[in-house]
Amino acid sequence: MSNYFQEFDNKSVIITGAGKGIGRATAIEMARRGAKVIAMARTQSDLVSLQADIGCTTIKVDLSDNVAARAAMKQAGTCDYLINCAGTNVLESVLEMTEDGYEAVMGINLRAALICAQEFARARVASGGGGSILNVTSIAGHRGFKEHMCYAASKAGLEGATRVMAKELGHYGIRVNAVAPTVTMTELAAAAWSDPAKKDPMMVRHPIGRFANVEDVATAIVMLLSSDASMVTGTILPIDGGFLAV
């Protein structure tokens, strides 16, 4: 078994969406375990505070801009790991879905993740292979949630892409996996799920009896990047307290 607090020494990781939520928690956890973190986010103040906390390298970028996304990945250089955490949602019903909503969600959740993965993989192959990609998806890609039309499609699409990446990149020594969290209690989610009428029916569907916190997801991500998971690729790991099991 690896020593997590030594394994990531002298290793570098790109984390998109690192300013808030799961991305920020993962950046903190990877830095705590010795990794050099290159944090990407669109909000400068988030990057400034994260840099003050963990001493990371920061890149301010709007990943919905294809050209900017590729430029940011090239600026980051060849790294050992990529964690695609950047995500967004626009709540629209099937009948009210707009093209703008579709583009906003797909642009960040799917297209940007694929661009970042492609640039990361190209750099790894050019340097001799190896490394690992971790995509953050959602249980929304497995179950139908009201007003999550585009979000569900984007996350299911990223899971499909994860499997294709694992198949195509495996012989270069690059592992590709994903985690699929349930409701995760970021500051934004805590406010959204504060109403018991909304929260309680969802909570009861979790055998473990609670929603996830960002640390639950971050530590699972670290495990999948570690050498303890060296035989794991093409896997979608639910972080859901048993939600998908019932």
Residues of each region from the PLM?
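Conserved glycine-rich cofactor-binding loop
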Residues: G19-K20
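Substrate-binding pocket helix/loop in short-chain dehydrogenase/reductase
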Residues: S93-V94, T98-M106, M202
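Active-site loop immediately N-terminal to the catalytic Tyr-X3-Lys motif
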Residues: L95, R143-M149, H171-Y172, G209, ...
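Active-site helix of classical SDR
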Residues: A117, S154, T162
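Alpha-helical segment proximal to the catalytic Tyr-Lys
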Residues: R122, K167-H171, S230
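Residue(s) in the substrate-gating loop at a strand-loop-helix junction
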Residues: S138
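C-terminal substrate-recognition "lid" of short-chain dehydrogenase/reductases
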Residues: Y172-R175, R210-I239, F243-A245
